[in-house]
Amino acid sequence: MEKIKVANKYQKSIDLLNDALGKEIATSLQYMYFHVHFEDAGYEYLSKKMRMISIAEMRHSEELSDRILFLQGDVNMNPSFTTRQISDPKEMFRFAIQLEHSTIDSYNDAARIAAEADDSVTHKMFQDLAVEEEEHLDYFRNELQNLLDYGDKEYLALQSFARSKAEAEGKVSE
């Protein structure tokens, strides 16, 4: 279907949304990378949580894409960065914290710019996304702090113990 080309008063919002889309796609891929490495190491809870967050980031990508299309923009599905090959859990959490901080800052800026452009829906979308990213940030901070408090061996052993206990009780699920 051919789109009618007109001057789009929402071009600023479309650009912000596409920038966010690239970040969400890249972040989803990064967290999926972490998920498979935690799973391979036998850390079921960490793996499942990372998978859930990766899927949440992909849902964000879909929401952003839907908004771009509604505004009659063109969706750019290119990830904004290449997946980093990180295998150390502390470094995984540190990088995730860095990603979430950066994303929250950019979403707060985008919300402000969208409001200035009189695009209240995109403004609210960025505010809502920032809230979800703050939840991810809180999780990553807590896990990193636990890892630092307990030390690598104890923290990861607790992850394995929790998995074994849950499996024995039939509580491990998606």
Region roles according to the model:
Residues 1-174:
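Iron-associated oxidoreductase/ferritin-like identity signal
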